[in-house]
Regions:
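Sec-dependent signal peptide recognition
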Residues: 2-10
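Long alpha-helical, hydrophobic tracts
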Residues: 7, 33-45, 65-79
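C-terminal motif of bacterial Sec signal peptides marking the signal peptidase cleavage site
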Residues: 13-16
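Pro/Thr/Ser/Gly-rich low-complexity, intrinsically disordered linker/stalk tracts
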Residues: 18-58, 92, 105-150, 201-231
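Solvent-exposed loop/turn segments flanking beta-strands in beta-repeat/beta-sandwich domains
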Residues: 46-73, 140-169
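Beta-strand-rich modules
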Residues: 60, 85-115, 176-214
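Short beta-strand segments within Ig-like beta-sandwich modules, predominantly Fibronectin type-III
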Residues: 74-81, 168-176
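Blade-loop segments of beta-propeller domains
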Residues: 78-85, 124
């Protein structure tokens, strides 16, 4: 019995030592080498950066620092097992500076490598040009095209008695051919505004239009229930 107990304790001690060795990370203050050979591929609303990783044994990841809007900083990281970073969220096609830094397991950062990206037209802009809003029974119906299946919100606003637009509905979608309806309205003419917004807060140009919803009347089921069928 004592031999079995000693054996079990020995095994547990070996496991504990192994776990300690596995989780122990040597720390230092030596910064890793920077990435090199950076290639930029501009995409709608962003860019893909391909690079050569440094040879540092304790490399942890690569980080990209950039500004989405004036004064709004953002970052994205990629592990040491890949050699590309995808940057998204730009609302315009203006040139931007992106800084790439390598980070090691001691969280030391390399000197930054600066590259220039020039995003293609943002999805919100492209989708916004396809927006349509038409009269529907008891409301309005919106249509839009989203070929890239971007995550978007379609925001519908209506003008109130103070001539101010207020949000009355929002449709969340990633489908290619999107459509949605807002109902519960009378037939009086109404001023609407509709636009696209993405998860970074970028918005398309708004479509403003005046629409009179179609008359809608709830069907009286008692008419059918009260009807008799020949032969009954």
């Amino acid at each position: 019995m004592k031999k079995n107990l000693l054996y079990i304790l020995s095994v547990l001690l070996l496991i504990a030592c192994s776990e300690e060795e596995r989780t122990f990370v040597k720390t230092d203050s030596v910064a890793p080498q920077p990435v090199s050979n950076v290639e930029v591929t501009n995409i709608p609303g962003g860019a893909i950066l391909k690079y050569t990783l440094p040879d540092d044994e304790d490399l942890l990841c690569v980080k990209a620092n950039y500004e989405l809007k004036s004064g709004v900083s953002s970052e994205v990281k990629a592990s040491l097992f890949v050699d590309t970073l995808k940057i998204e969220g730009f609302g315009t096609e203006d040139e931007r500076i992106v800084e790439l830094v390598a980070i090691d397991r001691s969280l030391n950062e390399s000197s930054p490598v600066k590259v220039t990206v020039k995003p293609l037209e943002a999805p919100v802009v492209t989708i916004g040009r396809t927006l349509k809003l038409i009269a529907d029974f008891g409301g309005v119906h919106a249509y839009w095209d989203n070929p890239g299946r971007s995550e978007i919100s379609v925001i519908l606003e209506q003008k109130d008695n103070n001539n101010e637009f207020n949000r009355i509905d929002a449709y969340y979608s990633t489908v290619v051919e999107g459509s949605a309806a807002t109902r519960g309205m009378d037939t009086d003419p109404k001023d609407f505004k509709i636009y696209i917004q993405d998860r970074w807060g970028n918005v398309s140009e708004a479509l403003e239009t005046t629409i009179s919803p179609l008359f809608e009347e709830q069907f009286d089921l008692s008419i059918i229930l009260g009807m008799s069928i020949v032969g009954d």
